Design a protein with these regions (language model features):
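Intracellular loop-helix junctions on the cytosolic face of multi-pass helical membrane proteins
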Residues: 1-13, 125-136, 143, 147-148, ...
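Pair of pore-lining "gating" transmembrane helices in MFS-fold secondary transporters
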Residues: 8-49, 266-287, 378
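Short amphipathic helix-loop junctions that connect adjacent transmembrane helices
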Residues: 34-70, 289-306
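Transmembrane alpha-helical segments of major facilitator superfamily
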Residues: 75-83, 308-317
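Helix-to-loop junctions at the C-terminal end of transmembrane segments
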Residues: 84-101, 320-333
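Cytoplasmic membrane-interface "Motif A"-like loop-to-helix N-cap segments
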Residues: 96-112, 330-342
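C-terminal ends and interior cores of transmembrane alpha-helices
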Residues: 107-129, 342-367
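Hydrophobic core of transmembrane alpha-helices in multi-pass small-molecule transporters
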Residues: 118-148, 278, 362-380
């Protein structure tokens, strides 16, 4: 007599709790990417020209601000370079780890706590014009976030049967985006431009320290929620049969024959997809890195506008994902992706024609933000 089939059902509560790992990741990266490029611009401008970026802008020497952007780009690219090296290392180490708290949790906890401690030192060293201290703090955060990242990503598949992982991935992404949204809210209520655009005498360290401290506290809280509610070893033992059933069902639905070599057509398609992904992410990361400086130094607008752009972009992405699925069903994925990339290209081209409004609205002489850029951001 055969045993009755195991019914697979997603544990939504557990998946939401696992999502707190992504909450911490996106929270930290949003603060890091929104504040650090401007910190680097100001501190290198001061080191190279003896004046803050605000003084250079007021004095009509904005071209000197532009001249330090290559340094900013190199330093900000280090997280991607570190990811190429460190993510596979920590991923492999966590795969082989066995501990009373699981194989992923030791890396998640260590990465979280060390990053949370080092993170607030970035604005502190910046405020006191200490380039070495600031760069070292950034490096520590990068290294230990890489320790955190891969195990955090792997945790959900470890405790979720394969056929349910797509739905689970959607849930944890929502929790993660809440972390990114928390960072944008900090940027709206504590605009970086209020610090950057004022004189040295009026620059108060708390103006830039608070977002980093809050981010560190929320990261630790999210890690603690994860630790006290998700017991890796216990869950894996409890759902062992479900995981095995999930593997069996996945093998039936999408059989893969590893013994057959990849065809030339499939190989060419793979390389084309990888090339497209590479170019897309290179473009998107470049814009993401410099958008804060673009708003503060070129448009001369308040930095909170950058955060509003982030929110608008996030909402537009969610709507776009929903629409794209339906379009792909009708015209195919290839044409859907091509149309999407074409629309993004048009958005970037239009963005190059945006110029400062010239209308002073801020206490430090900031201009009003071009409304058209909000529209372009939705398009791109």
């Amino acid at each position: 007599m055969s045993s009755s089939p195991i019914k697979l059902k997603l544990n939504v509560k557990r998946t939401l709790l696992i999502g707190f790992a992504f909450f911490g990741i996106l929270l930290l990266w949003q603060v890091y990417d929104s504040w650090c490029p401007t910190f680097l611009t100001d501190i290198f401008a001061r080191r190279m020209y003896g004046m803050s970026s605000a003084e250079l802008k007021i004095g009509g020497d904005a071209h000197k601000i532009l001249s330090v952007q290559w340094i900013v780009g190199i330093i900000m690219a280090c997280d991607n370079l570190a990811a190429l090296i460190l993510l596979p290392i920590f991923g492999r180490l966590s795969d082989k780890t066995k501990s009373p708290i699981g194989k992923r949790m030791p890396y998640i906890l260590t990465g979280t706590f060390v990053s949370a401690i080092a993170f607030p030192f970035i604005p502190l060293f910046f405020h006191y014009n200490n380039i070495l201290g600031m760069v070292i703090s950034m490096a520590i955060v990068l290294i230990f976030m890489m320790m955190y990242r891969n195990p955090a990503v792997a945790l959900m598949p470890d405790v979720t049967p394969k056929p349910l992982r797509a739905k689970a991935n959607g849930i944890i992404n929502i929790v993660g985006y809440l972390g990114g949204a928390s960072a944008t809210i900090l940027g709206i209520f504590l605009p970086l431009s209020n610090y950057i655009n004022t004189t040295d005498e009026n620059r108060k360290v708390w103006m830039i320290e608070i977002p980093f401290i809050i981010a560190s506290i929320l990261m630790v809280i999210s890690a603690m929620v994860l630790f006290f509610t998700v017991n890796e070893n216990k869950i894996e033992e409890e759902i062992k049969d479900e995981l095995e059933e999930g593997e069996r069902l996945a093998a039936v639905e999408t059989p893969i024959d590893d013994s057959k070599p990849m065809s030339k057509a499939n190989r060419n398609m793979l390389f084309a997809i990888l090339a497209a992904e590479f170019l897309w992410f290179m473009s998107d990361n470049a814009v993401g890195t410099y958008i804060g400086n673009y708003v503060i130094y070129y448009l001369n607008s308040v930095s909170s506008a950058t955060m509003i752009l982030t929110i608008i972009g996030g909402v537009a992405s969610v709507v776009g994902f929903a629409i794209a699925g339906g379009i792909a069903d009708k015209i195919g994925r290839k044409w859907t992706i091509s149309i999407g990339l074409g629309i993004s290209l048009i958005g970037y081209i239009l963005m190059s024609f945006i110029s400062p409004s010239g209308k002073v609205v801020g206490v430090n002489g900031e201009f009003s933000f071009p409304v058209l850029l909000y529209v372009i951001w939705v398009i791109k």
